[in-house]
């Protein structure tokens, strides 16, 4: 069943959510974090050593593995019922990883890479021991050939989210079909209902992702060994091999970021249309497989080995938000209040009214890239249904609506929303502007290595001088995460 936007708004809106969901229902969910980051040497060069033995087999370690490169660590949390639990686990696991690296090796707390060697020397992640290993390596070789090795080293944070099944079941049971259908005998299945809910979130997230990019963006600089496609967009040199821009907060999300070679716009009106479109992209040679579709938010299936069939048969299980830059100003590269806001933002995308503007995806991509590359330009304008609007005006309007939603539903905090308002009213309070000030003073590589050292010292101190390793929340995970440790 496919519903028009106006009917979807009648199905998912603030009144319906307030009537059928408690604040506790909405505060809980299934939350997970995936964090990618490079290993670097003290001089700011990419570490070319193999994945540390202490973490064991990449394919069997569920929490610490590699992403594209052998030099690119990925931390993966299990799912938790609250953001507090997910963030605490992730922060601990980050401490564990950072403290386990050799003394002359550090995590690079930037989404854009460090000093890179010749492309031929960048090590693709090596896998062995399972049938999946060869397939994983071949897939990565294909990406390297298609997009270039340097671009593969762009790193970021993924936030996995779904509502609790109990809440979804409650919303489904209280569904008033007369709101959307004249045929009283018709009935949407539970799977269809979930799909509709997550698809509406996805559509609105894509429409408004520019706001998340502005509020959390922190990739304003690169080293000149990175791809010229990106460095040419950065108008300043730090005279130490680094380049940076004062125009926008997130070149990871900019036009030069990690994106498909051509713009691909699958339908988000139904799972059937989405999977049909993605399959056509594969058939036409734009994608090698479904997971090569790079979007700001992904529909995640029950069976990741057969994405399209599982989405059709099992429905959408959860959403993966892929927008967040690594933040160097906190020891694990992520700040919890940004996660709290992102959670509220996702709830907002469910209840926000939708527009029937035909070219909404093209417009959303324009806004995404303009916010990423030029949000600090006072004259920059976004597009809303074809009409120009300032980022400040639109952003504050959205935050007012989120504030109203939070008051009605009894979630969130006024101080959290106010802090986001302040970032819009005063760009100097954004992470990107803070990073620009640091780079002007110390240079890109020097400033980021200094932060990497501080973060490593902080992580080691916490593990050595607190009870974290014996904390009941974490201690059962340590031998699994450090499965390669010598006994």
Regions found by a protein language model. Name each.
Residues 113-114, 222-229, 362-372, 418-426:
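A glycine-rich phosphate-binding loop feature that marks nucleotide/adenosyl-phosphate handling sites
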Residues 48-51, 87, 120-121, 171-172, ...:
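Short conserved micro-motifs at the rims of enzyme active sites and ligand-binding pockets
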Residues 130-137, 315-323:
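Active-site-adjacent bridging/hinge elements
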Residues 18-20, 133-149, 153, 162-313, ...:
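Loop-rich catalytic cores of soluble enzymes, especially ATP-dependent carboxylate-amine ligases
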Residues 2-131, 135-144, 151-155, 200:
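Terminal catalytic/cofactor-binding subdomain
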């Amino acid at each position: 069943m496919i519903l028009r936007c106006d009917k979807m708004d009648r199905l998912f809106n603030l009144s319906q959510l307030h009537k059928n969901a408690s604040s506790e229902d909405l505060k809980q969910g299934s939350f997970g974090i995936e964090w990618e980051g490079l290993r670097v040497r003290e001089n700011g060069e990419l570490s070319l050593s193999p994945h540390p033995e202490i973490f064991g087999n990449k394919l069997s370690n569920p929490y610490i593995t590699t992403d594209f490169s052998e030099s690119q660590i990925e931390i993966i949390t299990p799912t938790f019922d609250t953001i507090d639990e997910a963030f605490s686990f992730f922060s601990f696991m980050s401490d564990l990883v950072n403290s386990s690296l050799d003394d002359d090796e550090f995590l690079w707390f930037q989404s854009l890479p460090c000093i890179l060697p010749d492309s031929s020397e960048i090590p693709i992640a090596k896998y062995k021991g399972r049938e999946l290993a060869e397939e994983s390596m071949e897939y990565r070789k294909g990406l390297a050939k298609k997009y270039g090795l340097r671009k593969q080293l762009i790193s970021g944070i993924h936030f996995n989210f779904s509502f609790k099944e109990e809440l979804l079941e409650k919303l489904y049971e209280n569904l008033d079909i007369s709101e959307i259908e004249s045929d009283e005998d018709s009935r949407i299945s539970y799977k269809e209902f979930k799909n509709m809910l997550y698809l509406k979130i996805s559509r609105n997230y894509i429409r408004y992702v520019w706001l998340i990019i502005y509020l959390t963006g922190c990739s304003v600089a690169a080293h000149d060994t990175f791809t010229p496609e990106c460095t040419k967009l950065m108008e300043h040199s730090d005279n130490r091999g680094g380049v940076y821009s004062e125009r926008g907060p997130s070149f990871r999300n900019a036009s030069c970021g990690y994106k498909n070679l051509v713009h691909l716009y699958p339908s988000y009106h139904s799972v059937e249309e989405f999977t049909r479109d993605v399959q056509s992209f594969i058939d036409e040679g734009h994608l090698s497989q479904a997971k090569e579709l790079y979007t700001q938010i992904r529909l995640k299936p029950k069976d990741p080995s057969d994405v399209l069939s599982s989405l059709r048969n099992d429905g959408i299980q959860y959403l993966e938000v892929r927008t967040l830059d690594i933040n160097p100003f906190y020891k694990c590269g992520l700040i919890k209040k940004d996660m709290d806001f992102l959670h509220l933002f996702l709830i907002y995308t469910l209840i926000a009214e939708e527009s029937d503007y035909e070219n909404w995806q093209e417009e959303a991509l324009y806004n995404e890239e303009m916010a990423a590359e030029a949000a600090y330009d006072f004259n920059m304008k976004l597009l809303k249904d074809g009409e120009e609007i300032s980022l400040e005006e639109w952003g504050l309007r959205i935050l007012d609506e989120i504030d109203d939603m939070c008051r009605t539903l009894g979630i969130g905090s006024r101080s959290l929303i106010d802090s986001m308002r302040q970032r819009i009213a005063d760009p100097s309070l954004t992470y990107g502007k803070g990073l620009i000030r640091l780079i002007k003073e110390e240079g890109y590589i020097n400033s980021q290595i200094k932060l990497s050292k501080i973060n490593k010292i902080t992580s080691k101190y916490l593990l050595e001088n607190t009870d974290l390793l014996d904390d009941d929340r974490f201690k059962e995970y340590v031998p699994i995460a450090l499965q390669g440790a010598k006994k």
